[in-house]
Amino acid sequence: ASVVAETLGGLEYPSDALRENWQRFLWHQFHDDLTGTSIPQSYTFSWNDELIAQTRFAETITTAVGAVSRALDTKVKGMPVVVYNPVASSRRDVVKATVKMDKRPSGIKVTSQKGENMPAQLISWENGIAEVLFVAQVDPLSFSVYSIQPGRTSSSGKLLAKNGTLENTIYKIALNEQGDIASIFDKKNNRELVQTGKPFRLMMFTENLSTDYPAWEIYKKVLDGPSISITDNVKITVAENGPLRASLRVERTHEDSRFVQYITLTDGAEDDRIEISNEFDWQGKKALLKAEFPTTISNEKATYDLGLGYVKRGNNIENSFEVLGHQWADLTADDASYGISILNESKYGWDKPDNNT
């Protein structure tokens, strides 16, 4: 974005600021900082430096996108919104925008530069300010202008959240009474993805056998032993039920810890993706929290992301059980007929106890 902004003549390239903040960020890229195993006092410096770097990087990209936006043709019928895709691949995904609207609209109409009506949803309206969701499709490293105005919302009408179930054109998801995912049925392939009686769930191991490094050392016998499901004070509600995005909210507790999850499907975006957003107030001590996915897919090996590559690993063994994976892991059937990929934002420890999990 900064290169484009400079090319258009609107902004000098911020090389000094980028170098300074990149070096500040790299200062803390080593194992004690990243894994949370430094002494508590050191994190006074770590958090401060990371927050400064993050804030200044955000300012840099916001300033650059703003400079480019001012150079674009934003003459549209409604309120113009510029969407920037910073990655080197095309994207079609849900965008959240805040726009001015004098009156609360009954619906939202979003139009692309090509005149295509995009799926959209009104989240809220208060005091002339509307929060809107819409689907944007943007080429790699590119900018696109969209028009937002009151109007009829484009929808297939096949997105629904109710009574612990969530459904779109591809999946039907059912939760059990504990708030765990008991079923994911792929309607297009006529296939159940969750093992019968073994839901996708949060699980906790409370036996910590490490005496030297209890903050990070994990024993295989602990992972092979009993686990606790998070099932206290379960509340399942519908968080969203719009034409573009629908979500179930699951709230649970365990002792002093509180767990809130949002399970989300879309209609008109990346509809084959199930999103689970976690908001945890973790007060546990001497405990390990994991998410478990017992699938109906079988393979002795799973594939793990390494950032610039990938690696295949087998089931847990005595000297390799808690393993590294960056942002995704994939389990594809032996005959390559079907597969599931689990993407995650910031947790890099995985284990594979059997062919299906």
List PLM regions with ranges:
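Metal- or metallocofactor-binding catalytic centers and their adjacent structured scaffolds
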Residues: 1-72, 77
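C-terminal (or distal) subdomains of carbohydrate-active enzymes
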Residues: 55-58, 62, 66, 70-357
